[in-house]
A protein has these predicted regions:
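Conserved beta-strand position repeated across blades of beta-propeller domains
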Residues: 40, 48, 79, 90, ...
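Extended low-complexity, proline/serine/acidic/glycine-rich cytosolic segments
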Residues: 386-656, 687
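Conserved core positions of repeat-based scaffolds
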Residues: 3, 45-48, 57, 95-98, ...
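Loop/turn-rich, solvent-exposed surfaces of beta-rich toroidal or solenoidal domains
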Residues: 251-253, 268, 294, 299-313, ...
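Conserved loop/turn at the beginning of each blade in beta-propeller domains
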Residues: 18, 32, 40, 82, ...
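Short glycine/serine- and acidic-residue-enriched loop/turn motifs that recur at repeat junctions
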Residues: 2-22, 56, 60-74, 106, ...
Length: 687
């Protein structure tokens, strides 16, 4: 491992005999024969996670941020975490957080702003404690700002806590700081790939590259074209088409990495940390032109500096504040354009074999930065491994997806019932719109990155295949749980105002589930879904219309037939089994949804118009009676409808009887016209 930067408190762990400022990479191996997996840097402390799950810390310890009683440059193990297998660590200015392989979070250090999430406000916590508020969640990611934290759960729920002076918690206006994790409901339904915290600003990244930012924006670090703080997540529209796959935040600047290896930066630029050959702030995302000839695979931001790794050459480039040696260029001055970090670097597949000086070269594995320090995991040529690629999302770190592999695992968990937590986790994921929305992405030529009000970005064929697999008898226990989850949680919780188009894919996915076509589930699934669709606000409703116009005719016809079937089902005797208000709401929902589909079909001609016919209606509904009842309502006579209803029915019955008698006697049309109650006299009788 190599490290460089500011070490006045020993936080880089290089040793007390070295200078306060380390301006170029120094080899560092604090634990021989032990592999470091991750490094997190706080304001003046560092946390090291080993491959075996142990955690070591060093640096300043005034608030207990090291989790043990020692202080200084020598890393010491946190004994309180020895019984846990830690898989991820993060640091704030003076606090630390660790994530276990069981999805539990532990925090310690400064807590005066609630940043530890322990419910109580404490100035300093010297021993790691479990964040109990998240005990029912399986946490996958955690990120720390200076005095706040963000956490992403497996079911897509997103939590924040700590200081909220600038709205960095995303909980809305006038919300005070929070000492316990709070759910950010405004991102519900969006399948998230990453959460990232800056000094006092926050970001969330969706699986399809949508970027949402909020919090402090005094330097334009949210990329929203202004310098106004935001209290709730806001879509960074200028990045929507860039296929963003990773975000890193400094104190007041932000860097994003695209799938093609491009780097965009925005926010504070006073130290050159944006890499635009200037010291100006940028309120809009702007590509780092100096890196355009290279494909970048890793980025990392410190307090006021930025790093980028180019795998083809093995080089690390740095720019921004260098007064504390944090750029590793060998100098202590600010740099406003990407500059090579000093050292012997080589690509993983570089041609070093046989060279006499091959042992001098370092092969980068992973770069880390924070505060005024930088760490690089690397290896010698003969033992080198490919560098990590931040553009390849680690599936264990983002919103859980439903696929062949996961349904087999969940089926086994439900069969064993060895833990109520295991069952609860399955239920949470199956009930999550975010999990379903991210599960069937159209990955062919990255089509899902084009998700928009006109393009859903999902592969409905893969949806159908997975659902058909679930219908096999071997998955019956899981199927039962899915049905319960849809009925009790997922459909009732669908919002009338989804936060983004990515949260709307669920409306295309659910009708593909075979039980929706089964009349046994019309009341519990099919019709509630129709009601949820009809509750959508104007804009999301138009988005769904656009998406329906893009689907294949076969899918569209199934949807039409589904709700035609629901209408027939309701009219076939269900009126007497349901209370009137329920029957009325269900039949109205089915018919209005068919009307909505018909309007779409008029524009795109998915199916012939006669596919909307419901022939059974003529035998299930007395059209004449129904029409006259409707006519009276329309004429403003609703108040007397009930009084005349029985007379109306008697007259209609009388007309039918007389009509039958007339036909039996083979009377001519003139005689039929004179029969009391016939159509020519009906309005007169009513008068």
């Amino acid at each position: 491992m190599l490290c460089w930067g500011y070490s006045s408190f020993g936080q880089p762990g290089i040793g007390s005999n070295l200078q306060v400022i380390v301006p170029e990479p120094q080899v560092y191996g604090f634990i021989h024969d032990r592999n470091v997996k991750e490094v997190a840097c706080g304001g003046n402390h560092s946390v090291f996670l080993l491959e075996d799950g142990e955690v070591y810390t060093c640096g300043l310890n005034t608030k207990g941020q090291l989790g043990h009683d020692y202080e200084g440059s020598k890393p010491e193990q946190i004994g309180a975490l020895a019984g846990q297998h830690i898989v991820h660590v993060a640091c704030g200015e003076s606090h630390s957080v660790a994530l276990s392989d069981q999805g539990q979070l532990f925090s310690w250090g400064a807590g005066s702003d609630g940043q530890l999430g322990l419910t109580t406000i404490e100035d300093a916590v010297t021993v790691p404690r479990l964040i109990k508020k998240l005990n029912q969640q399986t946490i996958l990611q955690v990120s720390c700002g200076n005095w706040h934290c963000l956490a992403l759960a497996a079911d897509g729920q997103f939590f924040t806590w700590g200081q909220n002076s600038y709205g960095q918690l995303g909980l809305g206006k006038e919300c005070p700081s929070q000492a316990s994790p709070q759910r950010v409901k405004s991102l519900d339904g969006i399948p998230l790939a990453q959460v990232a915290a800056g000094g006092a600003h926050s970001f969330a990244l969706s699986l399809s590259g949508a970027v949402f930012g909020w919090g402090k924006n005094s330097s334009g670090q949210l990329g929203l074209s202004d310098e106004r703080d935001r209290e709730s997540p806001c879509h960074v529209k200028l990045l929507r088409s860039q296929k963003v796959v990773y975000i890193s935040c400094g104190e007041e600047h932000t860097a994003v990495l695209t799938k093609s290896g491009g780097v965009f930066t925005f926010g504070a630029g006073s130290c050159g940390q944006l890499g635009h050959d200037s010291m100006n702030d940028e309120v809009n995302p702007r590509r780092v032109l100096e890196l355009m000839g290279s494909e970048v695979s890793q980025i990392a931001c410190g307090r006021h500096h930025t790093l980028a790794f180019v795998p083809s050459s093995g080089m690390i480039y740095a720019f921004g504040c260098g007064t504390r040696g944090q750029l590793g260029t060998g100098h202590t001055c600010n740099v406003k354009c990407p500059s090579p970090v000093k050292g012997h670097w080589a690509a993983h597949n570089g041609q070093l074999s046989g060279k006499p000086d091959a042992c001098k070269y370092h092969i980068v594995k992973h770069i880390f930065s924070g505060g005024d320090q930088t760490f690089v995991l690397c290896s010698k040529y003969e033992n080198s491994l490919p560098a990590d690629d931040f553009r390849t999302i680690n599936e264990t770190r983002y919103t859980c997806l439903i696929n062949d592999e996961t349904i087999d695992v969940w089926r086994q968990k439900l069969l064993e019932k060895n833990s109520s937590n295991s069952v609860n986790n399955v239920v949470q994921i199956l009930s999550s719109a975010a999990c379903w929305n991210g599960s069937f992405l159209e990955k062919k030529i990255d089509e899902h990155f084009k998700t928009s009000p006109k393009i859903p970005g999902i592969d409905l064929n893969s949806t159908r295949v997975l659902f058909e697999k679930l219908m096999n008898s071997q998955h019956s226990i899981l199927l039962d749980q899915i049905l319960k989850s849809f009925e009790s949680f997922l459909i009732p919780q669908l919002s009338s105002s989804p936060p983004d188009v990515e949260a709307m894919r669920i409306y295309l996915i659910l009708p593909e589930f075979p039980p929706f076509q089964d009349s046994k589930y019309y009341i519990t699934l099919t019709l509630p879904l129709a009601m949820a669709i009809l509750r959508l606000d104007t804009n999301p409703s138009k988005v769904l219309d656009n998406w329906w116009s893009q689907v294949c005719p076969r899918y569209f016809l199934r949807l039409v037939d589904l709700y035609k079937g629901a209408v027939v089902y309701l009219l076939s005797g269900r009126k007497t089994l349901l209370i009137p208000v329920l029957f009325s709401s269900y039949i109205t929902a089915a018919l209005r949804l068919l009307e909505k589909l018909h309007k779409v079909n008029q524009k795109v001609k998915h199916v012939e118009y006669d596919k909307f016919y419901i022939p059974e209606i003529s035998s299930l509904v007395d059209i004449q009676e129904d029409y006259l009842m409707w006519f009276l309502h329309q004429a403003g006579m609703a108040g007397i409808v009930n009084n005349v209803a029985s007379d109306l029915k008697m007259l209609l019955c009388k007309r039918r009887q007389c009509g039958v008698l007339a036909r039996g006697l083979n009377q001519d049309s003139r005689d039929v016209g004179s029969i009391p109650g016939s159509s020519s006299n009906l309005l007169g009788d009513l008068g």
